[in-house]
């Protein structure tokens, strides 16, 4: 073979367009990630040979069967022909013999030559039958041949498919001899050139140029085989894309991989679409088919989202949003043995019925004197020991109507409710409310009938009135203990304590003493020097100094603990109230306080709760916007009184804000633009100036910087220590913002006795004043048969010939009505004035 032929057979360099998917016009080279595989060609070849041999054997068997069938048909045709010939021969023999003359031999030969023609003429039906049999044989042979060809084609196709499957299995099971490589098309081409040159050099060393040429031919044959394999995999046809030797043949996935969808308790349509990797419109269409009309930002519940995701072919994983919180709560040591604990007693009743005075006598401390006006402003938590060494914890709740939520919290945290009712006052509204709170909390009631030392005291009346509210005393066959006491003189106090302890024994109160503590926040406030302070009632376990406490939205390490007397303590067991310092913020009263192990996890739970509360708040605001869309159209007609509330404790802030919200009317609305616990700061004053608000301080004062802003901006700042005064003054301020109300008052009535005509004034009515006073400048009405026929004003009022300003009852006068001349005898002229009536809330 010449050098030119070798050169022609050498592998030609492919164009850059076929080897890569980009050009070098912009200086970029596409980088491909490939894996080289070593394919066992011997196994592929062996599989192909076996498949071809099998197809050949099947074709031969089919051909042999067809040949046998054809021979059998031919034999049957010959047998039929012989039978027909025998029949003809028998016919000949049975015919009469014709005498043959010796000298007539040529004539005898003629009939022998014409014999076949005579036979054909004699039996044309048999000839037609033979033709039909021959045609039938031909058709059978043609059909058998076509069937054999089809079977051969099918066998060849099966053999080709088996060969492809064997080749793919061999390729998959082949050993990988190279790791992933990151290389360009130029680098791969250069590597191949180097390999060919090195092979050529080795060939020249042993055997000359021929071995190098042989190696090039083998390389070319291998590449051609690879191309053919790629063509077989990708399919045949004119439009089939040719596989490139430099491009990895990746098969596209037949079906889109649908990821699992994690769904929380609530999710918006947009978030669900994002997790499912589909357009939000697809979800909206699916929900429309399910009968639900939603928007892209609408929040849907977990069950609906699960149905939609499963309908669209996704697997759903339901997630509880409180998983982190549950995990933190489960990692607590609460398996200790339970022991008997002290009862928690809440003292409830109507305002000024003597609750704090009763507790004051029990504690032997003057607390009521410290309360402004003798009214308890927030919950007080105390624990006392009886003479026999047993302990009782008391919660003193406010009795004023504004402190409903605080009474509800007190009842929730309590074991026994002591209902204080004044013997001289009886059952009052807050008494009934206290009964309802006690029943809602499931706490038994002990009734303390107070002020029995007064002369007008009537304990039997109290029992009768409570009987109407299903509080039945033991005297009437019920289970409620009634104890008559006097907080002022100390009468019956021991009997009350004994009744409380007896009730606690019936309840069999127990709690875990050792282990991680849990409790409830009774009250909280912000102390200027100490920071956030929370009064926590421990319900189980022991709260120690240094514990990590998770409290609603807040968390922190207990830096210090104090009892109700301000004394430092290091630990507090069940039923003991303590003040806790060290929280990250002021928790809401009523929040559950729990000791956890990890401060980092406690912070995560607190932040999660804050975010969840923020979402709920925003959703509620959005709902309120939609619901109040039409009412906001007339918002310009409603006057607003902006108020900033600062109080000493969280419970007072809640009570004041709730009471102010209840004062709002259709015309004047109270808007609390700011509220908080602690003293009034410069920030509060700046907010009041910007929002034109009234500042209300409840048991707090403004600091020096705040006072400077208040004086400069002329802000209305008011201090209160009793909630009655606060609400009354806010009502007065709201009353001043009401639109005035006008009322018409009749001041005089005159009866027309005669009518005179005057050229200048027209009709003049001579009248007698029958009621009140007729005034010249006031508006009038003309009545006929007690029906108003004209409303206007007087043009003239004369007594005799003198003009007068007014005419009193029982006197005669002449009245000229302006722009009205149809006055008749018997009409009545009614004089009235418009009076502005002061409105109040």
Curated annotation (Swiss-Prot):
Superkingdom in the source lineage: Bacteria
List of residues binding GTP: 349-356, 396-400, 450-453
Keyword GTP-binding: yes
Segments of this protein annotated with the region G5: 486-488
Residue segments, region G2: 374-378
Region annotated G4, chain positions: 450-453
Name listed for the protein in its UniProt record: Translation initiation factor IF-2
Organism: Actinobacillus pleuropneumoniae serotype 3 (strain JL03)
Annotated function: One of the essential components for the initiation of protein synthesis. Protects formylmethionyl-tRNA from spontaneous hydrolysis and promotes its binding to the 30S ribosomal subunits. Also involved in the hydrolysis of GTP during the formation of the 70S ribosomal complex.
Residues covered by the tr-type G domain: 340-510
């Amino acid at each position: 073979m010449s050098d030119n032929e070798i050169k022609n057979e050498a592998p030609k360099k492919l164009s850059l367009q076929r080897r890569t998917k980009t050009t070098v016009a912009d200086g970029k080279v596409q980088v491909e990630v490939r894996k080289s595989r070593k394919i066992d060609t011997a196994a592929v070849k062996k599989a192909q040979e076996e498949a071809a041999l099998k197809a050949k054997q099947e074709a031969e068997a089919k051909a042999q069967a067809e040949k046998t069938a054809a021979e059998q048909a031919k034999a049957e045709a010959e047998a039929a022909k012989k039978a027909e010939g025998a029949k003809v021969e028998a016919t000949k023999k049975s015919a009469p013999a014709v005498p043959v003359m010796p000298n007539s031999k040529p004539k005898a030969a003629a009939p022998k030559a014409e014999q076949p023609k005579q036979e054909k003429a004699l039996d044309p039906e048999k000839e037609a039958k033979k033709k039909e049999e021959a045609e039938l044989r031909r058709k059978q042979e043609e059909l058998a041949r076509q069937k054999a060809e089809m079977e051969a084609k099918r066998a060849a196709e099966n053999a080709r498919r088996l060969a492809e499957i064997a080749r793919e299995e061999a390729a998959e099971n082949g050993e990988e001899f190279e790791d992933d490589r990151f290389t360009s098309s130029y680098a791969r081409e250069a590597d191949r050139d180097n390999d060919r040159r090195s092979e050529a050099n080795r060939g020249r060393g042993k055997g000359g140029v021929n071995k190098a040429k042989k190696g090039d031919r083998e390389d070319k044959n291998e590449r051609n085989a690879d191309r053919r394999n790629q063509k077989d995999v990708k399919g045949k046809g004119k439009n089939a894309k040719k596989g490139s030797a430099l491009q990895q043949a990746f098969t596209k996935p037949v079906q889109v991989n649908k990821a699992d969808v994690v769904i929380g308790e609530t999710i918006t349509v947009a978030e669900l679409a994002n997790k499912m990797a589909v357009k939000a419109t697809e979800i909206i269409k699916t929900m429309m088919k399910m009968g639900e009309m939603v928007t892209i930002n609408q929040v849907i519940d977990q069950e609906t989202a699960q149905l939609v995701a499963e309908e669209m072919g996704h697997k759903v994983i339901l997630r509880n949003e409180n998983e982190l919180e549950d995990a933190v709560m489960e990692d607590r040591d609460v398996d200790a043995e339970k022991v008997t604990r002290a009862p928690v007693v809440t003292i409830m009743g109507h305002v000024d019925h003597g609750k704090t005075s009763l507790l004051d006598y029990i504690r032997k401390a003057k607390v009521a004197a410290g309360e402004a006006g003798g009214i308890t402003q927030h919950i007080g938590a105390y624990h006392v020991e009886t003479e026999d060494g047993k302990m009782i914890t008391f919660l003193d709740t406010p009795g004023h109507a504004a402190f409903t939520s605080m009474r509800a919290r007190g009842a929730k945290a309590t074991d026994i409710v002591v209902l204080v009712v004044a013997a001289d006052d009886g059952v009052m509204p807050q008494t009934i409310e206290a009964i309802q709170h006690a029943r809602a909390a499931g706490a038994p009631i002990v009734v303390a009938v107070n002020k029995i030392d007064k002369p007008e005291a009537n304990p039997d009346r109290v029992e009768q009135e409570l009987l109407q509210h299903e509080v039945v005393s033991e005297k009437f066959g019920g289970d409620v203990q009634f104890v008559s006491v006097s907080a002022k003189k100390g009468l019956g106090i021991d009997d009350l304590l004994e009744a409380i302890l007896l009730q606690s024994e019936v309840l069999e109160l127990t709690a875990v003493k050792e282990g991680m503590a849990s409790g409830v926040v009774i009250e909280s406030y912000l102390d200027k020097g100490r920071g956030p302070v929370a009064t926590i009632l421990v319900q189980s376990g022991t709260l120690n100094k240094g514990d990590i406490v998770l409290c609603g939205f807040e968390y922190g390490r207990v830096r210090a603990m104090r009892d109700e007397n301000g004394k430092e303590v290091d630990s507090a067991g069940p039923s003991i109230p303590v003040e806790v310092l060290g929280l990250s913020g002021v928790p809401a009263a009523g929040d559950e306080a729990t000791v956890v192990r990890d401060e980092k996890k406690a912070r995560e739970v607190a932040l999660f709760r804050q975010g969840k509360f923020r979402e709920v708040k925003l959703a509620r605001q959005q709902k309120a916007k939609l619901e109040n869309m039409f009412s906001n159209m007339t918002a310009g007609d409603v006057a607003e009184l902006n108020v900033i509330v600062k109080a000493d404790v969280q419970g007072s802030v809640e009570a004041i804000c709730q009471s102010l919200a209840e004062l709002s009317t259709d015309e004047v609305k109270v808007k609390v633009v700011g509220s908080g616990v602690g003293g009034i700061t410069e920030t509060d004053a700046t907010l009041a100036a910007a929002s034109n608000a009234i500042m209300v301080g409840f048991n707090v004062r403004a600091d020096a910087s705040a006072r400077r802003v208040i004086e400069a901006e002329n802000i209305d700042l008011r201090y209160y220590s009793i909630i009655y005064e606060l609400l009354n003054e806010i009502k007065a301020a709201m009353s001043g913002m009401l639109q005035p109300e006008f009322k018409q008052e009749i001041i005089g009535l005159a009866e027309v006795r005669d009518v005179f005509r005057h050229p200048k004034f027209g009709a003049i009515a001579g009248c007698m004043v029958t009621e009140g006073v007729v005034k010249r400048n006031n508006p009038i009405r003309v009545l006929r048969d007690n029906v108003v026929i004209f409303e206007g004003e007087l043009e003239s009022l004369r007594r005799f010939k003198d003009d007068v300003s007014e005419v009193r009852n029982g006197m005669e006068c002449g009245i000229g009505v302006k722009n009205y001349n149809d006055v008749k005898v018997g009409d009545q002229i009614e004089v009235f004035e418009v009076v502005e009536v002061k409105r109040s809330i």
